[in-house]
Amino acid sequence: MCILRHISYLLKSQSSNVRSHVMKRDELNLGEGVIHSIPLIRKAIVYDFLGQLALEPTALAQLQEQADMPFALDTSTAEFIPFHAFSRLLSGLRRHLGATVFVSSLQLIAKHASINLKFNQATPENVITSLGLRALNVETSAHVTRVEAHASAFDQIETELFLTVYLHAYMKARYPNLQEPSAYYLPHPQGQPLTELQIRNDIPQFLGQEHLALEYPALEGIERINVCAEDKPFAYYVEQALSAYVGRVDMSLDVFSELIGISKRTVQRSLKQEGTSFREVKEALNFTFAKRVLIQRNSAVGDIAVHLGYADATQFVRAFKRANGITPLQWKKANQPYD
């Protein structure tokens, strides 16, 4: 994707200004009845991305740990991971690799991902769900085909570049005759170092835009797309964001709040509006995990209790029985498959 070969200066110019924390998004909580969501990215996208990185395993593991990324994704039953954790990983990768290598890696990985993950078969609904978008619009006028993505707020330009590259890979997979973009638009705000940035006169880039977008020379036959993400209960997003960490990290509400970039108060209030709590969502996931490893791995109750963060096996058994009416071993006996 040639337009991104010229953005390394942009990345280098702000290397000293990249914030290590995730912006708190209390501004999303505009009042009663507002639907909240947590940005998620499909695990398969991330797993493929990590598998293609040309990094020494120890270095990659350290970057993942610093970003609070879930580990052992290949054995996790989770479908999604929090996009903010992946966003922090992207920022760490850019600092580790340098701007030029980071950009070229994004391009190469996205190109291979379009084959590995069969982007040519993905529906628009698949795309917005997989990439954590709120909406995707594609329209063609007399001279321009415009691809516009509505995403939740991020404060890292690396995430915007990742989405730009992957959206381009999706469009090229669907329409092989599509030319290179004629312009691209990033929500990243204009800053003093960026106002002096000159990329290419024939492929302009615009910062401080409301939405991320790509524009191409018009191509006949491109279908008009106007799809929005399905609204779901906030508890669903909490469950999906937590799922990859269950049995690996005993996550408190404070840590979870930092992980997703939403204040603890907002998480509590949003769940309370739906008649549930963080503890209830977390316990339900814990018990699902426990049931799975009781059967599939024949794990001991004490080991499960430790993995799930309980003080001891007795505390876990009591919690399990309170929710399920029977003890873990009674449940295992009743659900053990016969040979």
Can you say where each PLM-predicted feature lies in the sequence?
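Extended mid-to-C-terminal alpha-helical interaction segments
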Residues: 178, 189-339
